[in-house]
Amino acid sequence: MKTLIARHKAGEHIGICSVCSAHPLVIEAALAFDRNSTRKVLIEATSNQVNQFGGYTGMTPADFREFVFAIANKVGFARERIILGGDHLGPNCWQQENADAAMEKSVELVKAYVRAGFSKIHLDASMSCAGDPIPLAPETVAERAAVLCLAAESVATDCQREQLSYVIGTEVPVPGGEASAIQSVHITQVEDAANTLRTHQKAFIARGLAEALTRVIAIVVQPGVEFDHINIIHYQAQEAQALAQWIEKTKMVYEAHSTDYQTQAAYRELVRDHFAILKVGPALTFALREAVFALAQIEQELIAPENRSGCLAVIEEVMLDEPQYWKKYYRTGFHDSLLDIRYSLSDRIRYYWPHSRIKNSVETMMVNLEGVDIPLGMISQYLPKQFERIQSGELSAIPHQLIMDKIYDVLRAYRYGCAE
């Protein structure tokens, strides 16, 4: 990361896409997409997804590392080219507890990530815990971030410190996505970004972390990009010029969250304006979901009723029976809920892919379709971009490759924005 940031600060148009997903097909796509390039691939886990207690994926940081490396071995991607990052590391998972208890767990969380070899660490202590004022004072946020940084430094080896980098600050909304519809977004003001940096510098120095400050590579701000389940707020470069100019005076870049669904031209503008780390998650699993739904429609027409997977029906049944991952985000009313379950840009389906019933139904669908020749006309109907690539000889009409290429479409837009 440090080399890339140095190149950007030296004037190169270069950025990096941060792949925030634990889905094996998304990680496989991210690695396969850049297998024949010289670029590094940044893959990040969030604190609620992967933590010392397993998170909602059931994986500790060390488990996640081995999970990613196993996929890299399968793809033929050198693990030395993988950068592992931890996102929103702090009290996010334990906000219902008092600050002392939540921070104690947060310290162990950060240590677990660093011990597991994660080299990009987002120190985010912005969440209020039980008994805390809402919002927290910037000084409190910075002091808690310094405690987390101290934890990271205490377990990092000398070799690790050469690669270790920190990201500070946070954006709105908190990790997980918007819980309600959005119409506009508040762009971070320069004075707020400057205050975030100033308070963190003061807190770090007070804890003897002056050297660690040199490892702070980025600050998270809101550049004016956001999405919810039905809306996308697109980047307006002219609105972020004050931020772009301010960061030029520092040794850092910006990290932009929720950049999913922006145009490829917007990604290029964001990188030009020093939002050099672009995070993406739901857009990748949304593309996966689109591919699975398309293949399910193809299966419906090609496979005998008694042998079909019933994939789409299984997904809906499971999500309606177990609504905990979408209920507070989606619209009420049965019809609206169904539309959001299927097509929401927030893509809460991503939490359900590991469910045994859904996983088994998708596997059945894939086996069914691998055993037949999919007519080109059906691929044109349901996956038109992939049809064009089949026609030009770039792609084969194999279900797994069709899913990969659908995910590549998202990665292609980021490559356009980030490429030197």
Swiss-Prot record:
The keyword Protease does not apply. Keywords: Galactitol metabolism. Pathway: Carbohydrate metabolism; D-tagatose 6-phosphate degradation; D-glyceraldehyde 3-phosphate and glycerone phosphate from D-tagatose 6-phosphate: step 2/2. GO terms for biological process: D-tagatose 6-phosphate catabolic process; galactitol metabolic process; phosphoenolpyruvate-dependent sugar phosphotransferase system. GO terms for cellular component: plasma membrane. It holds the Pfam family GatZ_KbaZ-like. InterPro entries: Aldolase_TIM, GatZ/KbaZ-like, GatZ_KbaZ_carbometab, TagBP_ald_GatZ. It comes from the Bacteria. Component of the tagatose-1,6-bisphosphate aldolase GatYZ that is required for full activity and stability of the Y subunit. Could have a chaperone-like function for the proper and stable folding of GatY. When expressed alone, GatZ does not show any aldolase activity. Is involved in the catabolism of galactitol. Belongs to the GatZ/KbaZ family. GatZ subfamily. Forms a complex with GatY. This is D-tagatose-1,6-bisphosphate aldolase subunit GatZ.
